[in-house]
């Protein structure tokens, strides 16, 4: 396990060291010491979370690949503020697990899943929380059900490019809160659910035409 800048407090260090001595601390993301140790460890996979942009030498230190999760359906919603922008663009709320490359959320996709919106939501924040939890669950599932069993996760290339998302401003969030209360997540969930296939999504032209 590798902990970077925001996890260097002594109390947090001690918490992790209670469970394992195999914990490494880095002073700087993408720093030379981090790159050297990753190379020395000769790892197959690097799993990241909220880590910022990785430079190519760090990505290449993992023999098979670097995995990350994303609280939206790739390739339709990349960047920030992706849950609100997804709903705004007619994309169902969901989550993805993917291989990291030098682009922003552009790596090959491993798995995607819709947020279950069959029950009502009352704010955008609720949907965002569900998407965050689902993203983490998908990543853990990939680790335990695939990598943990000696399988190398599939790669589904992102052949389609969509406009990057940005954070919603205060007024946009208020508008989206109202749309959420009116059932936008549930409507999109019903619309996208038939396109789901086990482990992936239909990326046909029909699907593309659904995205505004």
Where are these regions (language model features)?
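One-carbon transfer enzymes
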Residues: 1-212
